[in-house]
């Protein structure tokens, strides 16, 4: 007899259970786990934000924010609803993008592995849109708002 957390078990039963456990420990879907371990979407999102920031440096941050940032007056009067999405990928300064991307790199791989690529992408985009809508609702009409902070806070909320 072998002492076990649930009492005593015979040696043959323990050996048989161990053999069955070793036989069934393979992956259910071969190769899928390896693909999910690569945080592709996280790196793509960081890349999009970085390229948008570098382009805005070349053209002028104020110009890019003026044309694509979340400005309630343009959404309310001109119906430029695309600004709610484009503002998520724009940033004011190197510190702004740096801290947002740092947190995205810290949280993204874990959440992407848990949720999968598609649901992680939807989480990021919908949380970013939610942040932009909140900014739209609570900001003065002439204020410009940009950044992935709403999406980042959505990712933090998903960890809870």
Model-derived regions: residue spans:
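Cytosolic juxtamembrane regions of integral membrane proteins
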Residues: 3-41
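Solvent-exposed, charged/polar functional surfaces in cytosolic regulatory/catalytic domains
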Residues: 16, 110, 159
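Short intrinsically disordered, low-complexity coil segments enriched in acidic
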Residues: 1-8, 93, 100, 156
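Membrane-interface micro-motifs in multi-pass membrane enzymes
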Residues: 144-160
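Solvent-exposed, non-transmembrane amphipathic alpha-helical segments
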Residues: 16, 21, 29-34, 71, ...
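N-terminal TM1-TM2 helical hairpin plus the immediately adjacent luminal interfacial "cap"
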Residues: 38-148
């Amino acid at each position: 007899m072998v002492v076990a957390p649930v009492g005593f078990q015979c040696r043959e039963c323990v050996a048989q259970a161990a053999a069955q456990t070793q036989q069934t420990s393979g992956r259910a879907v071969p190769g899928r786990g390896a693909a999910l371990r690569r945080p592709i979407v996280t790196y793509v999102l960081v890349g999009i934000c970085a390229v948008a920031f570098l382009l805005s440096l070349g053209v002028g941050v104020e110009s890019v924010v003026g044309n694509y940032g979340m400005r309630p007056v343009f959404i309310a009067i001109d119906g430029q609803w695309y600004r709610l999405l484009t503002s998520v990928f724009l940033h004011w300064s190197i510190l702004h993008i740096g801290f947002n991307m740092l947190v995205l790199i810290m949280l993204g791989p874990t959440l992407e592995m848990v949720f999968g690529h598609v649901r992680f992408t939807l989480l990021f985009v919908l949380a970013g849109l939610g942040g932009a809508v909140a900014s739209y609702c609570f900001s003065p009409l002439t204020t410009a708002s940009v950044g992935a902070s709403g999406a980042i806070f959505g990712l933090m909320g998903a960890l809870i």
